[in-house]
Design a protein with these regions (language model features):
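Arg/Lys-rich, positively charged N-terminal/basic patches that mediate binding to nucleic acids
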Residues: 90-139
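A short, surface-exposed loop/turn module that caps and links secondary-structure elements
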Residues: 83, 137-165
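Bateman/CBS regulatory modules and CBS-like beta-alpha motifs in cytosolic regions of diverse proteins
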Residues: 1-18, 28, 38, 61-79
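Non-catalytic interaction/Regulatory regions outside core domains
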Residues: 1-5, 9, 78, 82-106
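Short, charge-rich, low-complexity interaction segments located
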Residues: 24-63, 89-99, 103, 151-152, ...
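Enriched for short, Lys/Arg-rich terminal
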Residues: 51-55, 100-111, 162-202
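Short amphipathic alpha-helical segments
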Residues: 27-31, 135, 139-140
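Short, small/polar residue-rich loop motifs at catalytic or cofactor-binding pockets
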Residues: 19-21, 109
Length: 202
């Protein structure tokens, strides 16, 4: 629910509230709603959601990626090497101690595993070389290291999915917090879509 911010409210306090609670704060002027304050992460999630929902082809690709994951058409464990044929990024992930598959974890182990839909691998191969490399670096790096912070949440029909822009690619994924598993749904070539032009550094 939106929280009204009157003239006497301290801006820094309101910003802290927005970041801590994810409230959308309505700013009043002359007693009437004049503007809304929300976190940058939420704004970008809304922008991506609107852009994606206006492109039926992209929505269809996301749903096809979801269907592939649910039907078992996916890569996991050692099979994930298919996403990185030259083994420049996946090897670094393994030697860095990050997991690539859901496995029993000791108490206190907060690492995340990864599985990827077959359509996402095909999409990765179709990207320009430098974009594909940057995307692999993200997937086998920051995405596994801090998946919740690495992307922004989508809204509406696309809710419960996260998105991150890397160069001209938009990485769509889900988080399974019970299995601590990142599910890579699809990688979209978005070109001039709104949002940042590189991967997020929140």
């Amino acid at each position: 629910m939106a929280v009204l911010a009157g003239k006497g409210d301290d801006l820094e306090t309101v910003v802290e509230q927005v970041l801590a609670t994810r409230d959308r704060v309505v700013v009043e002027r002359a007693g009437a709603p004049a503007a809304i304050m929300m976190s940058l992460r939420e704004l970008e999630g809304l922008e991506y959601s609107i852009e994606l929902l206006s492109e039926p082809k992209m929505v269809r690709r996301i749903l096809e990626g979801e269907a592939a994951l649910q039907s078992g058409n996916l890569y996991m464990g050692e099979e994930l090497a298919a996403l990185d044929p030259e083994a420049r990024f996946v090897v670094r992930t393994l030697t860095g101690g990050l997991s690539l598959a859901p496995t029993p974890r000791a108490a206190g182990d907060d690492s995340w595993g990864l599985c990827a839909s077959m359509p996402s691998r095909k999409a990765l191969d179709e990207l320009q070389f430098h974009v594909a490399d940057a995307t692999r670096n993200f997937v086998f790096g920051r995405l596994l290291a801090e998946p919740a912070a690495a992307g922004v949440e989508l809204h509406g029909f696309l809710a419960r999915r996260l998105a991150t822009r890397v160069e001209t690619a938009l990485v769509i994924y889900r988080l399974d917090s019970v299995k601590r598993l990142v599910r890579l749904v699809e990688i979209l070539n978005i070109g001039g879509m709104v949002g940042r032009t590189d991967n997020h550094h929140w």
